[in-house]
From Swiss-Prot:
Record: active site: D29, N77
NCBIfam families on file: uppS (TIGR00055)
Enzyme type, top EC level: transferase
Any one of the GO BP annotations: polyprenol biosynthetic process
Keywords linked to the UniProt accession: Magnesium, Metal-binding, Transferase
Gene assigned in the entry: uppS
Cofactor note: Binds 2 magnesium ions per subunit.
CDD domains noted in UniProt: Cis_IPPS
Protein name: Tritrans,polycis-undecaprenyl-diphosphate synthase (geranylgeranyl-diphosphate specific)
Known catalytic reactions: geranylgeranyl diphosphate + 7 isopentenyl diphosphate = tri-trans,hepta-cis-undecaprenyl diphosphate + 7 diphosphate
């Protein structure tokens, strides 16, 4: 344990000497496999995953990361059992309410945005989302985006449809359509920037339709640990890999 801490501190000092990514996105994979490994129920795996998200938030803000996007629930996840979906939505609501009560949300000026097709979510969760977004909308120092009922291809399709509606109404001319306009019609409404580093836990090496527009030129980092077992060392290694890639880019 002591050698682990020594290595972590050495790695932290090394990472702090370099640039820190502005926007990190994380695919939090492995909650259910973690639960199976530990002989737990799936909802217990999701609970431990939510506690890990709290921890990682603090690590990121302390390192100087300004924006964090967490993939909490995809549109494909609606295929899961009603019991598991209910547990996940209850956990999401609980975590959002915790953020509302947490003094660090206000000390750090954390703005919270939920991105995805929220009309697919339970009404009580939608109301909580609305409340946390309203209460934090003036915060500008740190940004947390939570992707819920999210699909990357659908996000782009919805943005295109929204622009086409404006074209039909005469509000936009076709020749005015550009990348900036499309970004302004994505779920984040232009408020979340391009992703610098995307991390996936759980051993899978794919991005699963997560932020295809925003992460087009990002560095992807895959690690084998299940999300509830993700360590600060793993985060620091991911940032170090990003720093290495950035320093070796061909201009």
């Amino acid at each position: 344990m002591i050698f682990h801490k020594i290595y972590e501190n050495k790695l932290l000092r090394s990472v702090r000497k370099g640039a820190i990514p502005h926007h990190i996105a994380i695919i939090m994979d492995g909650n259910r496999r973690f639960a199976r490994k530990k002989g737990l129920e799936p909802h217990e795996g999701h609970f431990f995953g939510s506690k890990k998200a709290e921890e990682v938030l603090e690590w990121c803000w302390d390192l100087g990361v300004k924006m964090l996007t967490l993939y909490a629930f995809s549109t494909e996840n609606f295929r899961r059992s009603e019991k598991e979906k209910k547990n996940i939505f209850q956990l999401l609501e609980s975590e959002l309410r915790r953020l509302l009560k947490d003094r660090r949300t206000y000390e750090r000026e954390l703005r919270v945005k939920v991105v995805g097709k929220r009309e697919l979510l339970p009404e009580n969760l939608r109301e909580t989302i609305k409340e946390v977004e309203e209460r934090t909308k003036k915060h500008r120092r740190h940004y947390l985006n939570v992707a819920v009922a999210y699909g990357g291809r659908q996000e782009i399709i919805d943005a295109v449809r929204a622009i086409l509606r404006k074209v039909r109404k005469g509000e936009v001319r076709p020749e005015e359509i550009d990348e900036k306009m499309l970004e302004e019609h994505l779920y984040g409404e232009g408020r979340y920037s391009k992703v610098d580093l995307i991390i996936r836990t759980g051993g899978e090496q794919r991005l699963s339709n997560f932020l295809p527009w925003q992460a087009a030129n990002s560095v992807a980092y895959f690690c084998d640990v299940y999300w509830p077992e993700f360590r600060k060392i793993d985060l620091l290694r991911a940032i170090r890999a990003w720093q290495y890639r950035k320093s070796h880019e061909v201009v």
